[in-house]
């Protein structure tokens, strides 16, 4: 079955980020001028700025058809299926007496290539398709080389007991765990988690810390911060406005390096 082999960043810039499509991150241009267009993302292409300035600043120029088309294209590109495959999945979903959209997503999620991707055996769905088509994956101890194979509950997905197969999957898993460790360290330096570590503040959950930040009750280095994903540094000073007054905390004791 044919699949998309064209430029991927162009697709992502047009319809949004797709985790299963590629690991690449596009460069998004933002209009830095004044007026209603300030902060708007410039559409992709050579004449993207012209397209942006032709639209009304406070109104969406996307029609209902374009919105639905983008949703359909996101499904098609993310799961790596053709138009005909998607139509067949929709027809099958309509025959079941449940929510058609929910059943359609179940069909797409039960594909073998998607399950291999969800198990972090491959970084993307196209990479998972390659693992399957090269015979590295087993389903119930049987070789399956069809990426669109529909798995069932209680199926056992395993790796072929070959040196090359085990090397490929172990390499992908190690890369996944390395990224998770990096994200965990970065998450622990965000403002809500730092506020949760400070016992004198008396916060019991991350949700409570995020609520304080979004309300503007937290200042870092005498500057108001309303973004929960703010990365703190050891030299920062956090000021929290409470009913008892303003509490200042130096982050040297709560951050290492």
From Swiss-Prot:
Designated name of the protein: Small ribosomal subunit protein uS4c
Keywords carried by this UniProt record: Antibiotic resistance, Chloroplast, Plastid, Repeat, Ribonucleoprotein, Ribosomal protein, RNA-binding, rRNA-binding
Family stated for the protein in its record: Belongs to the universal ribosomal protein uS4 family.
Subunit-level organization: Part of the 30S ribosomal subunit. Contacts protein S5. The interaction surface between S4 and S5 is involved in control of translational fidelity.
Organism lineage string: Eukaryota, Viridiplantae, Chlorophyta, core chlorophytes, Chlorophyceae
Gene Ontology cellular-component terms listed: chloroplast; small ribosomal subunit
Residue intervals of the S4 RNA-binding domain: 110-170, 189-255
InterPro entries: Ribosomal_uS4, Ribosomal_uS4_bac-type, Ribosomal_uS4_CS, Ribosomal_uS4_N, S4_RNA-bd, S4_RNA-bd_sf
A GO molecular function held by the record: structural constituent of ribosome
One GO BP annotation of this record: ribosomal small subunit biogenesis
